[in-house]
Every structure is written in C-alpha cells, then in structure tokens.
Amino acid sequence: MSTVKIISEEMCVACFDENVKLYIYDCGHKCCCKECFERVERCPMCRHLPVENIKPSTHVPAIPSAPSFELINMEVETREIHPRSSRAKSIAKRMVYGMGPSFLDKLFDCKSGRDSMAWGKMCCICTKKTNDEMIKSKICESYYCRDCRDYLFQENGADQPLPFCPCCFKKYNGFEHVSAH
C-alpha cells in the first residue's frame, strides 16, 4: 500500500515547511513561503511567470533587420511595461520575428523581399538555421528541418503522423502537406 501525504493550506509546496504564511502569485495560486517566493521564479503549480519576477537581462540576441520595412520601436514600448528591462525588449522582438514571414506579410501587407529575409529558412520548431534540406509546409508555408520532421511526423510510426501542423494547428491528412524545399 502506498501512502499519500495531504498538503495542508499552510504548507509551502517548494520547501514543504508547515504553518508558514503563504504568498499569492499573479496566477492566483497561494503556495509558497516568503523565502521560496523570492527564490522561485515561476509559480510551482502552473509555471506562470509573474510580471514582478521578470529580471532585466544584459544579453539581447542579434535580430536581423527586415529589408523593406522597419519594425515598431520596441524600446519606447518596453519602458512603459517594465523600466530597464532589456528582457522584455528581447521577448517582444522574438515574438514578432518568431511569427515568421506569413505573420509579417499579414501585419505589414508586404510580400517583397520575403525569401531574402534572414528567417526565411529557419525551422519553426527548433528555430535553428541549418544547411540541410528544409521541408516546407503547404498549409502555412513554415519550414521544418529533417530532425524535427522525423521526430514530429513519425513519432507514432510512419502510418500515424501528427494529425495537425505543429505551427498553425490546422488539420491535414498524412504527409501531403509537406514538400522538400
């Protein structure tokens, strides 16, 4: 017989100290003592990242500039969200660039220079650029590297690939939506 330990409402779920004052995260979970609340970056229950726990980062990844238009000035917008936060700036840039060319085409109504953009042949799953042959989706025009395609589309065996595109979540039948590019 296995024993089940019932966690009381005054028990910290991170260090298991009992009869302590618990702090509430932005997500609404009341689960950590003061020491764990200051130490643990995300909510232990749902992994939600509270806004006040976003720490400034000194590293901002190099993002290629778009050839035919200029993106929104991220510095002005991030100062309003969180002062001195280059991490918020980095997240905002990655969100815009991570959407890929189809998102930017819809946002800016621009199709010129699409193939010359730096992210044109980046895998939408692992976000790395490879010199290998990329596979292009016919549904959402996103690219997959060989490793991600083999892992995602043949995970359950060649007879049962994923029933949806992992980038746009549209349903499809088999491998007919991907083509070598």
Swiss-Prot record:
InterPro entries: Znf_RING (IPR001841), Znf_RING/FYVE/PHD (IPR013083). It comes from Ostreid herpesvirus 1 (isolate France) (OsHV-1). A zinc finger (RING-type) spans 12-47, 123-169. One of its GO terms (molecular function) is zinc ion binding. Transmembrane segments: none annotated. PROSITE patterns: ZF_RING_2 (PS50089). It holds the Pfam family zf-C3HC4_3. This is Putative RING finger protein ORF97. Keywords: Metal-binding, Repeat, Zinc, Zinc-finger. The lineage of its organism: Viruses, Duplodnaviria, Heunggongvirae, Peploviricota, Herviviricetes.
